[in-house]
Amino acid sequence: MKLTKFGHACVRLEKNDSVLVIDPGAFSEESALDGAQTVLITHEHFDHVEADRLRRAAEANPSLEIWTNEGVAATLTGVPAKIQVVRHGDTFDTAGFGVRVVGEWHAPNHPDMPIVRNVGFLVEEEVFYPGDAFTPPGVEVPTLLVPTNAPWMKASEMVEYLRQVRPARAFSTHDGLLNDAGLGIVDSWLGLESDRQKAEMRRLKPGESVTLP
């Protein structure tokens, strides 16, 4: 399975000519959706979902499937795709990928902002994308897509999460708000934890791909 990082919080998975995209929000490149058969969306914030680009993707591929929570689905009424609502504990198959849903809520953010629903996705029992939360996956996770910068988190929480999950490999997500100096700090912290756990932990640049075992 091939994993490609796009801007900020978007990743693309490819397997046997099937394409699955997670969280193609406003800070990612729209080309992430080229040829996509299915899209997973963790929550409704604009940096994770952008309705107009999903509409264009659905117009290009009328069989496009979108799997998400009820809060996101309510915002996509004008998108001509097959929209499926999922919740914590659900499992489903889409475009040849097996997916398990893990988690229910976004991490607390601003005290005056409501907490929205957030679902994480474990794809093919290989890649876990928690969305905007440090949700324990509850199972062994070979590849973790770990949030590394956000208004709702501290860097120390990222490290604690890596130590809790103990993946074989971890790649940065949710890093699009950082300048070069901030990205350098992320690289340093991931490098330190990589050395400590003797596991691959690093930041993928936008457009960079890795082949998973």
Locate the predicted segments by residue.
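A short helix->loop->beta-strand "cap" motif at the edges of active sites that frequently abuts
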Residues: 60-65, 165-169, 197-199
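Alpha-helix capping/helix-boundary segments
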Residues: 46, 72-73, 90, 135, ...
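Active-site metal-binding motif and surrounding structural segment of the metallo-beta-lactamase
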Residues: 26-68, 142-145
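Core dinuclear metal-dependent hydrolase active-site scaffold
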Residues: 1-34, 85-140, 151-157, 205-213
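Binuclear metal-ion centers of metallo-dependent hydrolases, dominated by the metallo-beta-lactamase
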Residues: 1-4, 77-95, 159, 169-213
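Short, Asp-centered acidic motifs that coordinate Mg2+ and/or phosphate
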Residues: 19-20, 38, 143, 169
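Metallo-beta-lactamase
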Residues: 119-192
